[in-house]
Amino acid sequence: MHGLFSSVVFFLSASLAASHLPVFPPATTASSPYELASVTEKSYGVYGELGQTDIVWLEMQGVKGEDMTVSLQRSEKRAVYDVAIWGKGLDNVTCGNKNWYGWAHSVGGHYFTRNLTELPAAVRDAIGSSEAFVLHGDGVESPEFEPFGVGLYWPLGGCKDTFPATATYRMALVNPKEELAAYSLGVGMVESFSFTDLLLMPFVIYRTFVWSGRSAEAVIGIFALSVLIFYAFRLMTLQRNSYAAVGNQSLLTVSLHVLWVCAGAFFASGVSFLFQLILCFTVKPDLGTIVLVPLFVHILLPIIFAFLIFFLYQPYGRWWIKLGAIAAGAYMLFFGWMAFLIFPVLSILVVLLHWVR
């Protein structure tokens, strides 16, 4: 048991240590940019789509001497985009003095320029007389596997240096081409997640699946079909003692069905990530040993939890089985992201109901 717990802690730590917080900014303007808070203490993955006339405005607070890292990536669809950065002291930033390129690359071509003439007029006006430079996201590199959200990204360019001052820095993402760009901008390198970040992760992870090129219908369809198959199979294998244990208490009977549906959602979460992993494998067959992290955290454990509830749980069963079911629900609440929050919460409430009855 201690070995299993240690394995869970190890894989969870590995998952979070190789990750950044995904965010999808709403519509922004030069006067109302999207703020990336505490970028020296927290890393972000900024996702979205960028048309030829679109501009995404971002803002971050720099701390003098702390790492300043910006990394440009895209989805599988071939595209380019540029990132203008301006603020105090940027004339002293060279972006590439360590030959750093993206999250995982170390090559000399860092695609850095101080020529602002190709930027849209609105961006040049916003920059004014501020010190600035532009990162060109037009690199051609092999895809990298991201185990946290189970996806692939294609590095395009980047900047690694230190903030020259404690000040506000602005960024503008622009698209110099006609093709729509599905961008992923990494900002910061410190992995940090709040309680709320983990609770709301299912909804941004779902959006990253769609961002990667899958349709929303396919993502939801696989989840719903997996839940239906699991629940239908449970109904087909009902044992009489499942109902003998609850007698004529309709509330407990209904709650037991709710728990089976929740277990189906745990199973569906594992299947959803498995399908996503297979798609990654078809593009990049060598995902490296880091693939063990999503296999364990996002696929194996949720499916195991689902079948443990399937085979072992009874409303009036032993207390340690109920405690295990609550622990499984808590795990899925924070790490079973394709169980969409509501199903882990419901599973915990159902088990607590059975415990007090």
What are these regions (language model features)?
Residues 17-56, 127, 132-138, 194-212:
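Non-catalytic extracellular/lumenal accessory regions of secreted precursors
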Residues 312-343:
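Membrane-helix boundary connector in multi-pass membrane proteins
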